[in-house]
Amino acid sequence: MLFLYACSRETEGPEKPVPDLLTIPPGFPEMPFPKDNELTVQRWQLGKKLFYDPVLSVDGTLSCASCHQASLAFADDKAFSPGVMSRPGVRNAPSLANVGYHPYYLREGSVPTLEMQVLVPIQEQNEFAHDILTIAKVLKEDSV
């Protein structure tokens, strides 16, 4: 993903996939990962940091965790999850449980990959109302 590539440091060494980072419950298949975005410790840590970081919203007030609450199975209990500047949302934030197994994203199935789906709330005017180029610049300057 261009977004994550722009956030990386050039001095970092190559990342190695870490297949045992996740414990797959009995009866579940292996989690599919794109060849160009395999799970690594660094990507896991970056994803967790970004999930809780309000820098992804244009006014710095919302993070993914604002609506995908851990105490609610990473879902929201509101019919329409609110966006930045108290803008009314247009959809409910669904649970993220087992999201890596989903064949498509958003209720209508309009987004084919998880890597593409993460861009939707960031750019949606009623959610984070931000743009990827600005976020990439801010994150590249971040010390983490």
Identify the residue ranges that each predicted region occupies.
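Sec-dependent bacterial lipoprotein signal peptides
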Residues: 1-5
